[in-house]
UniProtKB/Swiss-Prot annotation:
Belongs to the Mediator complex subunit 10 family. This is Mediator of RNA polymerase II transcription subunit 10. Component of the Mediator complex. GO terms for molecular function: transcription coregulator activity. GO terms for biological process: regulation of transcription by RNA polymerase II. The gene is NUT2. It comes from the Eukaryota.
Amino acid sequence: MTTATIDSSSGNGPLVSTTEQLQGLIESFIELGVLVHDNQGTQQSHTALTHKTNQVISQLSSLTDSGFTHQYPIPVDVISYIEDGRNPDVYTREFVEVTAKSNARLKGKMLGFQKLRDVLGDKLGKEFPELGSAIEDIKKRTTPDEE
């Protein structure tokens, strides 16, 4: 069962390849689970179980040796979510929510400091008119460029 599909293009070839490797690995784990559950204790079932275990080890090894998997490290939190049986999309959603809250807080701080700069500059300009050009220079240098 896949939750999303990846379009095959020249730019994401390694991603598609890794996705296919992971899908094959998941299938092998499912088949291995079935073999373990249905194990009769016979030589034939032992051979099938050994073969499937070696296949899983081989697939894990090829996935680990892939350069693409080292290029994009997976956060430990995501692995913990998966190990706990939770959906890793929950981690992504929570990460985005925390980042949005942090960005909103920082934006509020920036706006507060801009207002402080403007009010302080106006008050200083009224009290010390001879500093007017320096105050305007500071305001101009500390005002973010609007694009």
